[in-house]
Amino acid sequence: MQWTEVSVMTTNEAVEAVSNILQEAGASGVKIDDAADYANLKPGKYGEIVDLDSIPHRTSGAEISAYYPETIFVPEILPTIRQRVQELTQFGLDPTPGTVTTKAVDDESWATAWQKYYHPVRVTRYLTVTPSWEKYTPVQPNEHVIRLDPGMAFGTGTHPTTRLSMTALEMVVRGGETMYDVGTGSGVLSIAAKYLGVNQITAFDLDEVAVRSAKTNLDLNPIATDVVAKPNDLLKGIHHPVDLVVANILAEIILPLVPQAWENLTPGGYFLTSGIIADKLAEVVAAQEKQGFVIDNILQMKDWRGVIAHRPTEDE
């Protein structure tokens, strides 16, 4: 079977948004080649993860490649893709250069091409993300290994927004909590939360493809097989308060989630948000404070921000 590969050259900050655009246009899979991921592979405080010189890698920006089957007439969807990429500036994201190119590929070529870009990476103090096909043994005490099968649409777990979310979880989880993972995607945050001691988790995503992907990854991690993953639009229709609500989604989606999170958090419960570009932070913080949340901490990595907030108790 022949496929059409549609590739977009863009910035690190626009990777997730461009990936969403391509998938919403009907892509059967997405490959992400992000220079930021390779930067994270360099030796650091947790030691060397991989020999960077041993793999081909991008030194700046990012390329997102999506794959469309013969049943989709790609020339018809290209104008919309180009327009939506350029419109990302309206959401505070820089998509430049935003160039879109296409080429034909066969089934075998795209089915395995992405694997060379994915390696074990120490994401936080306690959490390492590794692909399911690579053997990896923890090298430090209390290191938890999250195994993912990203398939042909994946994130490595090293994007700043994911790192911020995992760091926030490490800061607030004490063990035994209940949690909602909103916009779960690959399910990586639910798996991380289980390793950190969260007891009961329900993961939601509007995209049923993402839900299936999350279920696959949950099954790869025995500690997380009891996580319930199902389709839902944010927390609409959910009326059962929990101790934690986690959302790694764009600021524009966080805003309508704020009142839903408030209604679904127990007093003292934490609301952890990421996916916030720096220019949108003030708007997100203002919305949370207006709702009644107390802002505990602002985390930052590159141009991205994460917010740790909680619903105050009656005594506060």
Curated annotation (Swiss-Prot):
Primary location recorded for the protein, binned into one broad class: cytoplasm
Annotated compartments: Cytoplasm
Record-stated family: Belongs to the methyltransferase superfamily. PrmA family.
InterPro entries: Ribosomal_L11_MeTrfase_PrmA, Ribosomal_PrmA_MeTrfase, SAM-dependent_MTases_sf
Annotated keywords: Cytoplasm, Methyltransferase, S-adenosyl-L-methionine, Transferase
Catalytic activity: L-lysyl-[protein] + 3 S-adenosyl-L-methionine = N(6),N(6),N(6)-trimethyl-L-lysyl-[protein] + 3 S-adenosyl-L-homocysteine + 3 H(+)
GO cellular component assignments: cytoplasm
List of residues binding S-adenosyl-L-methionine: T162, G183, D205, N248
An MF annotation (GO) of this entry: protein-lysine N-methyltransferase activity
Leading EC class: transferase
Protein's UniProt name: Ribosomal protein L11 methyltransferase
Enzyme Commission number(s): 2.1.1.-
Cysteine pairings via disulfide bonds: none
GO BP, one annotated term: methylation
Protein role: Methylates ribosomal protein L11.
PANTHER family with a match to the protein in the record: ELECTRON TRANSFER FLAVOPROTEIN BETA SUBUNIT LYSINE METHYLTRANSFERASE
Taxonomic superkingdom: Bacteria
One matching Pfam family: PrmA
